[in-house]
Design a protein with these regions (language model features):
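Single conserved hydrophobic/aromatic residue that forms the stacking wall/gate
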Residues: 166-178
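Core alpha/beta nucleotide-donor-binding catalytic domains of modification enzymes
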Residues: 1-25, 29-165, 169
Length: 178
């Protein structure tokens, strides 16, 4: 699978030499598979890898365990890791938004803060998020129900947005965990 993902990254010009890749890692199987693959590809593509973990303040002890797990793996694999903590339920009430929307806002803020710490041009900073084919299908159906246009039906593109948002999206969930 690593060979296919390397080809996919090169074909879509997702990571360039000397880029900084900020990997969003939740501790779930998809993001851990992505992190393992990025760690393996780091030497082949010559980029700097950093992990961003976001504690949303929603799932209590379970979220605390996810944070510890991610921090321990990063320490073991010698990958710099920054944890951003937010009180998403409190912010949702304050901002009068749903928790899902508030979560999107704080995640974007966390990546912008981490990108600023890197001291590089935006074009040299990539944000990697793990999505599998099931996630893509779910996003497409959600967008269709919302009455989206053609752009929304395209779901998640491999590289998108201000800081080159990377979606590692080729494997299915089963392939990612095997």
């Amino acid at each position: 699978m690593e060979r296919e993902i390397l080809a996919y990254i090169k074909q879509n010009r997702m990571i360039g030499k000397n880029d900084v890749v900020l990997a969003g890692v939740s501790g779930g199987s998809d993001s851990m598979a992505m992190l393992r693959i990025l760690k393996e590809l780091q030497g082949k593509l010559d980029f700097t890898l950093r992990v961003v973990h976001i504690h949303h303040g929603i799932r209590g002890k379970e979220a605390d365990r996810d944070q510890s797990f991610v921090e321990n793996i990063c320490r073991k694999w010698q990958i710099p890791c920054t944890v951003y903590c937010y009180d998403v339920p409190g912010l949702s009430r304050e901002w009068k938004l749903g928790e899902e929307e508030t979560g999107r806002i704080v995640r974007k803020e966390a990546f912008q803060r981490e990108a600023a710490v890197c001291g590089r041009k935006d074009s040299e900073i990539k944000i990697a998020l793990a999505h599998n084919q099931e996630d893509l299908a779910e996003t497409m159906l959600h967008n269709l129900c919302r009455g989206t246009g053609l752009r929304g039906l395209c779901t998640m593109r491999p590289v998108d947005g201000e800081l080159s948002l990377i979606h590692i999206s080729e494997p299915t969930r089963q392939e990612a965990i095997s």
